[in-house]
Amino acid sequence: MIDRLASGHFEVRAEIDGVPLMVMIDTGATTTVLSFEDARRAGYEPETLRFEIPIMTANGQASAARVVADEIRIGDIVRRRVPMMVAQSGRLERTLLGMNFIGTLSGFDMRGERLVLRD
């Protein structure tokens, strides 16, 4: 179970390619998008990526680059070969866990101030 933050969002510890990161669950995001800083932490060398894909973020329009996670893990839930994007530096404060991951689950439920992910 994931508790709702005071901000109203749900954030959870995920491991992306074995690197622990805090991600915000975003059912409005089509794709999982790494912040530039989290991409660096996860070993994607964002300075070498080509930011050619236009995306909309809470901060407005930005460009992103495509990458693929070998593995994303949230607790016992594991998905492999997950397509993701990396946002340009300074354009995304928090990595977003999008519907390309959430949609692979058998479901998710809101229970009061908690979110439950079901594999």
Identify what each model region corresponds to.
Residues 1-22, 27-119:
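Pepsin/retropepsin-fold aspartyl endopeptidases
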